Amino acid sequence: MAKILLVYATMSGNTEAMADLIEKGLQEALAEVDRFEAMDIDDAQLFTDYDHVIMGTYTWGDGDLPDEFLDLVEDMEEIDFSGKTCAVFGSGDTAYEFFCGAVDTLEAKIKERGGDIVLPSVKIENNPEGEEEEELINFGRQFAKKSGCAV
């Protein structure tokens, strides 16, 4: 069975909490998941090993990608995402002008490289709570189904 690559960047733990919930949903659907923090990926060629990719990020400053994702996104220029099912999630703060702008940047990069975004991106204010937790678990379940990785 094909595995799903789950990659995320976190600073305060909010995006990691989101990744935990998404992974829970994926596992409930019996999908196999390989999970990495963006800063631990030395080579974007890792993406070529997967047909299904979920990426999550927090937003830094005025809607920017965090440093942990900059090199990875730059290296994605060399990767063909055609035929890959993808989804994006992230945390942010509405106090800033561009709420979760880094999520939009990642989604645009995946589309530019030919990836198929199969679910609307999930954007959460700070740490997921209450109904947001169930939304993220469902996001994982839905991605597993849309990618054909659910059992």
Swiss-Prot record:
Source organism of the structure: Bacillus subtilis (strain 168)
Domain of life: Bacteria
NCBIfam families named in the record: flav_short (TIGR01753), PRK06703.1 (NF005216), PRK06756.1 (NF005246)
Region forming the signal peptide: none
One GO MF term attached to the UniProt entry: FMN binding
Family in the record: Belongs to the flavodoxin family.
Name of the protein in its database record: Probable flavodoxin 2
InterPro entries from the UniProt entry: Flav_short, Flavdoxin-like, Flavodoxin, Flavodoxin/NO_synth, Flavodoxin_CS, Flavoprotein-like_sf
Job of this protein: Low-potential electron donor to a number of redox enzymes.
Cofactor(s) annotated in UniProt: FMN
Residue positions binding FMN: 10-14, 88-119
Domain Flavodoxin-like: start-end pairs: 4-144
Keywords: Electron transport, Flavoprotein, FMN, Transport
